[in-house]
Amino acid sequence: MALTQERKNEIIAQFRTHETDTGSPEVQIAVLTEQINTLNEHLRTHKKDHHSRRGLLKMVGKRRNLLTYLRNSDITRYRELITKLGLRR
């Protein structure tokens, strides 16, 4: 269920803006999206796991805030990120 360190490093390498980047909004949003997707799969099989559901809602809210920040600060980076992640339809 949890995101492994290897998978997290792959995501960071894919979305980073420079060599030592681990905290840019793009990286944070990509890692949160991966965590949200894995937790979503978990909740499909364990429908009554309300503690995990609350964690999922907190992650979705944090990702929404980061996306709003990125949209307000740099719209081109925001558009590139949502197309890469496939967030908006």
UniProtKB/Swiss-Prot annotation:
Keywords: Ribonucleoprotein, Ribosomal protein, RNA-binding, rRNA-binding. The keyword Methyltransferase does not apply. It comes from the Bacteria. Pfam families: Ribosomal_S15. InterPro entries: Ribosomal_uS15 (IPR000589), Ribosomal_uS15_bac-type (IPR005290), uS15_NS1_RNA-bd_sf (IPR009068). GO terms for molecular function: rRNA binding; structural constituent of ribosome. PROSITE patterns: RIBOSOMAL_S15. GO terms for biological process: translation. One of its GO terms (cellular component) is cytosolic small ribosomal subunit. Belongs to the universal ribosomal protein uS15 family. Part of the 30S ribosomal subunit. Forms a bridge to the 50S subunit in the 70S ribosome, contacting the 23S rRNA. One of the primary rRNA binding proteins, it binds directly to 16S rRNA where it helps nucleate assembly of the platform of the 30S subunit by binding and bridging several RNA helices of the 16S rRNA. HAMAP family: Ribosomal_uS15_B. This is Small ribosomal subunit protein uS15. It comes from Bacillus cereus (strain ATCC 14579 / DSM 31 / CCUG 7414 / JCM 2152 / NBRC 15305 / NCIMB 9373 / NCTC 2599 / NRRL B-3711). The lineage of its organism: Bacteria, Bacillati, Bacillota, Bacilli, Bacillales.
